[in-house]
Design a protein with these regions (language model features):
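Middle-to-C-terminal accessory/interaction subdomains
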Residues: 1-52, 56-188
Length: 189
């Protein structure tokens, strides 16, 4: 089975690498809406894992298209990579020429396709206008649920004593990051 999937995925990547990208039939092999949503998720939380993907998944059922996800491994998110601190810079691009990882080249290529960019822009604008506030409320609700555990944990470990401050920092960072992504997505046509 491994050889079957290896051959199948290699066929996709070979097609994806062909020029011109516009009109390229690679879109018959991967769900580009799932790609756009995947990119939005990683961009919103600035998960640099995408640049050197050792924890990136996609899946495919039968003769269907590849679909990005499930998502996981977010320990290098929220500006942690390179700084070892969360919630610092919110205005840093997800992709960087200094990264030079295989993920950088692979995922940036999707954003060279106007079909993906159009889905990205539409999906992002819908999220920002209609769902961001719900996400921030979820952060508050989840923090309330975690509070008893955080208090017990703080009896042993000092790193959770600033929990309330970190929740506020997370929400502020997400709002600022969303505004930053707006400035990127507005140019997508």
């Amino acid at each position: 089975q491994f050889e079957y999937w290896k051959k199948d995925f290699n066929a996709f990547t070979t097609q994806f690498a062909k020029e011109p990208l516009e009109g390229n039939s690679y879109v018959d092999m991967i769900d580009i809406e799932s790609v756009a949503k995947f990119l939005i998720t990683f961009n919103l939380v600035h998960n640099m894992e995408i640049n050197h993907p050792k924890s990136v998944f996609l899946h495919k059922e039968g003769n269907g298209k590849y679909v990005m996800g499930p998502i996981w491994d977010f320990d290098w998110a929220y500006d942690y990579e390179g700084t070892s601190n969360h919630f610092g810079r919110y205005n840093t691009p997800l992709f960087s020429s200094s990264m030079n990882g295989v993920g950088t080249a692979f995922f940036q290529r999707f954003l060279q396709d106007s079909r993906v960019k159009a889905i990205y822009k539409r999906t992002w604008q819908d999220f920002k206008n209609n769902k961001l506030d719900a996400l921030l409320q979820y952060v508050d609700d989840y923090a309330v649920m975690l509070k008893p555990s955080v208090e017990r944990n703080s009896e042993l470990w000092e790193n959770t004593r600033s929990f309330d401050t970190k929740v506020k920092e997370l929400k502020t960072w997400l709002r600022n990051r969303a505004d930053y992504i707006d400035s990127e997505a507005v140019s997508y046509t």
